[in-house]
Amino acid sequence: MADEKPKEGVKTENNDHINLKVAGQDGSVAQFKIRRHTPLSKLMKAYCERQGLSIRQIRFRVDGQPINETHTPAQLELEDEDTIDVLQQQTGGVY
């Protein structure tokens, strides 16, 4: 009889962390490891620090949909190796 339980220390498919890619408009890609239930604000702030950007200057999107700081990867149904796009906020209009 085979024992179906995973051995201690061996990673399983249902681990608590996922790896996410954050793609900038300039083609750069940064990778982050984050817990599935951690608010994305942690990832957003870390990305801004790495890139020297203000969080007020950029917007984060998944599959074209805006995300905010309170969302978690689990809420957005993000999977391992999914990509979050970063766009610079554009201000414009008629003078």
UniProtKB/Swiss-Prot annotation:
Mind telling me what this protein is named?
A: Small ubiquitin-related modifier 4
Alphabetized CDD domains for the sequence:
Ubl_SUMO2_3_4
Biological process terms from the Gene Ontology for this record are: protein sumoylation
Q: What does this protein do?
A: Ubiquitin-like protein which can be covalently attached to target lysines as a monomer. Does not seem to be involved in protein degradation and may modulate protein subcellular localization, stability or activity. Upon oxidative stress, conjugates to various anti-oxidant enzymes, chaperones, and stress defense proteins. May also conjugate to NFKBIA, TFAP2A and FOS, negatively regulating their transcriptional activity, and to NR3C1, positively regulating its transcriptional activity.
Question: SUPFAM superfamilies per the record?
Answer: Ubiquitin-like
Keywords noted in UniProt: Isopeptide bond, Ubl conjugation pathway
How would you summarize the oligomeric state and partners of this protein? Interacts with SAE2. Covalently attached to a number of proteins.
Q: Which GO terms describe its molecular function?
A: protein tag activity; ubiquitin-like protein ligase binding
The record's similarity note reads:
Belongs to the ubiquitin family. SUMO subfamily.
* Gene assigned in the entry: SUMO4
Entry-linked InterPro entries: Rad60/SUMO-like_dom (IPR022617), Ubiquitin-like_dom (IPR000626), Ubiquitin-like_domsf (IPR029071)
In terms of superkingdom, the source organism counts as Eukaryota
Q: Residues in domain Ubiquitin-like? A: 17-95
Query: PANTHER family, alphabetically?
Result: SMALL UBIQUITIN-RELATED MODIFIER (PTHR10562)
Give me the residues of the propeptide, which is removed upon maturation: 94-95
Q: Which GO terms describe its cellular component?
A: nucleus
Glycyl lysine isopeptide (Gly-Lys) (interchain with K-? in acceptor proteins) crosslink: positions? Answer: 93
- Which residues lie in coiled coils? none
Name the Pfam families on file. Answer: Rad60-SLD (PF11976)
